[in-house]
């Protein structure tokens, strides 16, 4: 089984350093099509069974209403499952760009068994769960701040301990080359 996980940064193109981010910052308001096409070409070449997509635009003004998960699913022949990354009671869902920010998983099953859960802390709380290829695949995007990220990790460890089927936890863990990452 081949799995790919990619933070696509809303299809804005990945800046190479903070100076480049300043020059390309306008892409966060109107994403060019080229980076998303390049991501699709990459996935076509790799041919993964499961694709986890973080920072996916689900149809905001930035993409002229285009759902990036649907576009990449069309390019790969996989089925998209996507959810908004903020909890249903989040005030961010009332804002045009934020209400269309999500995460997605692309799988071969035509009617995948999927669910959205939410961590109890942080801004990005989504825990996207999909059963595919004989496993339960969890996709998360952890907090930027260390204390909140640690709370999320503890919550995930406790919550996923009860999962009795084979599983994979994947995502953007925002570790920034930390040397004190603990494995258990």
Locations of the language-model features?
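N-terminal, active-site-proximal structural segment of metallo-dependent hydrolase catalytic domains
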Residues: 1-75, 82-90
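Active-site flanking residues adjacent to catalytic metal/cofactor-binding acidic residues
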Residues: 6, 54, 140, 170-172
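Membrane-proximal envelope and lipid/glycan-remodeling enzymes
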Residues: 11-17, 138-140, 148, 159, ...
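Surface-exposed cleft-lining segments at the edges of enzyme active sites
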Residues: 22-29, 56-58, 115-118, 138-147
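Alpha-helix termination/capping residues and helix-transition junctions
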Residues: 45-47, 134, 161
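Structural motif
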Residues: 50, 135-136, 166-168
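Structured beta-strand-rich core segments of catalytic domains in phosphoester-bond hydrolases
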Residues: 55-134
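Metal-dependent phosphoesterases centered on the DNase I-like endonuclease/exonuclease/phosphatase
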Residues: 146-184
């Amino acid at each position: 089984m081949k799995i790919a996980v990619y933070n696509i940064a809303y299809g804005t193109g990945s800046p190479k350093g903070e100076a480049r981010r300043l020059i390309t910052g306008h892409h966060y308001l109107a994403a060019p099509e080229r980076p998303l096409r390049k991501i699709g070409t990459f996935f076509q070449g790799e041919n993964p069974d499961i694709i986890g997509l973080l920072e996916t635009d689900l149809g905001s003004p930035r993409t002229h209403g285009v759902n990036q998960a649907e576009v990449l699913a069309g390019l790969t022949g996989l089925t998209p499952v996507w959810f908004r990354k903020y909890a249903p009671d989040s005030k961010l869902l009332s804002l045009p760009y934020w209400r269309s920010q999500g995460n997605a998983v692309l799988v071969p099953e035509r009617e995948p068994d999927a669910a959205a859960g939410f961590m109890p802390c942080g801004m990005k709380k989504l825990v996207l769960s999909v059963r595919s290829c004989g496993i339960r695949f969890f996709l998360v995007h952890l907090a930027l701040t260390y204390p909140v990220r640690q709370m999320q990790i503890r919550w995930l460890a406790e919550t996923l301990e009860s999962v009795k089927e084979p599983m994979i936890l994947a995502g953007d863990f925002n570790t920034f080359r930390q040397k004190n990452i603990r494995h258990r």
